Amino acid sequence: MSTESMIRDVELAEEALPKKTGGPQGSRRCLFLSLFSFLLVAGATTLFCLLHFGVIGPQREEFPKDPSLISPLAQAVRSSSRTPSDKPVAHVVANPQAEGQLQWLNRRANALLANGVELRDNQLVVPSEGLYLIYSQVLFKGQGCPSTHVLLTHTISRIAVSYQTKVNLLSAIKSPCQRETPEGAEAKPWYEPIYLGGVFQLEKGDRLSAEINLPDYLDFAESGQVYFGIIAL
């Protein structure tokens, strides 16, 4: 009921009462009705304001109404957090002792293979069909720039059970050097990270690999800088 309706009801009630002139009883009744009307209007106005400005009422978790405002990775993480924990997941890290190659390891404190995912021949084997978030990061490090142009590549590939051909799913190329370090000049260090990530429909038995072209430039100074993984959505 609106505030205006309440005021009209009170006024009609006052008009319906028998009017008495003079005397202390009539004065007390008028005072009582005036006080009651004021409290009723004040209470209704306060309730209306509280409801209107959302001070009271049901609390709802607010998210952007437009799904496009939420990043794909955020949507994937939110969806995964609401599902059972028996979905396939893997996170493997690079072996810092493997010289001249990028070798993935799962028997480490910061690595994980769960719910059917296997690491076989340096590839992740998908245990079941579905949508997967695939990701990988590498970090390159060098000292100075040689005369030959340095091109660093990082690629995630898939060999499907339906067709035994390697197909690139994600790939990136970076060049850390714009020009050669002049002779006699100080060779300054450079760093180049490359991150890849995307969502793909995979089949049971698919094999996934994450590879680079120049493993000698990999930086293993800190644990967890080079990794590869999948998460079933």
UniProtKB/Swiss-Prot annotation:
GO-annotated biological processes: extrinsic apoptotic signaling pathway via death domain receptors; immune response; positive regulation of canonical NF-kappaB signal transduction; positive regulation of extrinsic apoptotic signaling pathway; positive regulation of NF-kappaB transcription factor activity; positive regulation of transcription by RNA polymerase II; regulation of biological quality; regulation of developmental process
N6-myristoyl lysine lipid sites: K19, K20
CC per GO annotation: cell surface; extracellular space; plasma membrane
Modification Phosphoserine, positions: S2
Any one GO molecular function term: tumor necrosis factor receptor binding
Residues under site feature: Cleavage: S34, L35, L39, L40, C49, L50, L51, H52, A76, V77
Residues covered by the THD domain: 88-233
TM region(s), chain numbering: 36-56
Intervals, Extracellular compartment: 57-233
Residues bearing attached sugar chains per UniProt: S80
Pfam families reported in the protein's UniProt record: TNF
Cytoplasmic side, ranges: 1-35
Main location: membrane
Disulfide bonds: C145-C177
Localization (cell): Cell membrane
InterPro entries according to UniProt: TNF, TNF_alpha, TNF_CS, TNF_dom, Tumour_necrosis_fac-like_dom
Keywords linked to the UniProt accession: Cell membrane, Cytokine, Disulfide bond, Glycoprotein, Lipoprotein, Membrane, Myristate, Phosphoprotein, Secreted, Signal-anchor, Transmembrane, Transmembrane helix
UniProt PTM: The soluble form derives from the membrane form by proteolytic processing. The membrane-bound form is further proteolytically processed by SPPL2A or SPPL2B through regulated intramembrane proteolysis producing TNF intracellular domains (ICD1 and ICD2) released in the cytosol and TNF C-domain 1 and C-domain 2 secreted into the extracellular space. The membrane form, but not the soluble form, is phosphorylated on serine residues. Dephosphorylation of the membrane form occurs by binding to soluble TNFRSF1A/TNFR1.
Any coiled-coil regions, as ranges: none
Topology class, membrane: Single-pass type II membrane protein
Subunit structure: Homotrimer. Interacts with SPPL2B.
Role of this protein: Cytokine that binds to TNFRSF1A/TNFR1 and TNFRSF1B/TNFBR. It is mainly secreted by macrophages and can induce cell death of certain tumor cell lines. It is potent pyrogen causing fever by direct action or by stimulation of interleukin-1 secretion and is implicated in the induction of cachexia, Under certain conditions it can stimulate cell proliferation and induce cell differentiation. Induces insulin resistance in adipocytes via inhibition of insulin-induced IRS1 tyrosine phosphorylation and insulin-induced glucose uptake. The TNF intracellular domain (ICD) form induces IL12 production in dendritic cells.
Family the entry assigns: Belongs to the tumor necrosis factor family.
Full protein name: Tumor necrosis factor
Gene: TNF
